[in-house]
UniProtKB/Swiss-Prot annotation:
SUPFAM superfamilies: Cystatin/monellin (SSF54403). The keyword Signal applies. This is Sarcocystatin-A. It comes from the Eukaryota. Gene3D superfamilies: 3.10.450.10. Keywords: Protease inhibitor, Pyrrolidone carboxylic acid, Signal, Thiol protease inhibitor. A motif (Secondary area of contact) lies at residues 67-71. PANTHER family: CYSTATIN-LIKE PROTEIN-RELATED, CYSTATIN-RELATED. The modification Pyrrolidone carboxylic acid is found at residue 21. Selectively inhibits the activity of cysteine proteinase of hemocytes, protecting developing adult tissue in pupae from attack by the proteinase. Residues 1-20 form the signal peptide. InterPro entries: Cystatin-like (IPR053128), Cystatin_dom (IPR000010), Cystatin_sf (IPR046350), Prot_inh_cystat_CS (IPR018073).
């Protein structure tokens, strides 16, 4: 009986402290899944550099979240190197709706610079 009581207390404590994932809420990207965020960002950087810019190269991703919206929305904080080899830490949002023409919208928000919003095809 004592063991059953202990098991019940442990179960209740586990359930009370569990944090269920909210459907549609942003989720932090970690570990191996960070590679996918890196690929998504590099693909957008390449497409934009081939067009009218901006021209950045990824140095490293500091943090990332992903969210299912009307498509997917990746919010990435990363160190980017510009065409003058200057490294800056920027917040980048990639909203992907690949079924639309030019359905990838990329927003760069870098300190001390105006926000840049560009679109490209999938």
């Amino acid at each position: 009986m004592k063991y059953v009581l202990i098991l019940c207390v442990i179960t209740l404590a586990t359930v009370a402290y569990a944090q269920p994932q909210c459907v549609g809420c942003p989720s932090e990207v970690k570990g191996d899944k960070l590679k996918q965020s890196e690929e998504t960002l590099n693909k957008s950087l390449s497409k934009l550099a081939a067009g009218d810019g901006p021209t950045y190269k990824l140095v490293k991703i500091n943090s990332a979240t992903t969210q299912v919206v009307s498509g997917s929305k990746d919010v990435i904080n990363a160190d980017l190197k510009d065409e003058n080899d200057k490294t800056k830490t920027c917040d980048i949002t990639i909203w992907s709706q690949p079924w639309l023409e030019n359905g990838i919208e990329v927003t760069f928000n870098c300190p001390g610079e105006p926000k840049v919003v560009k679109k490209h095809s999938a």
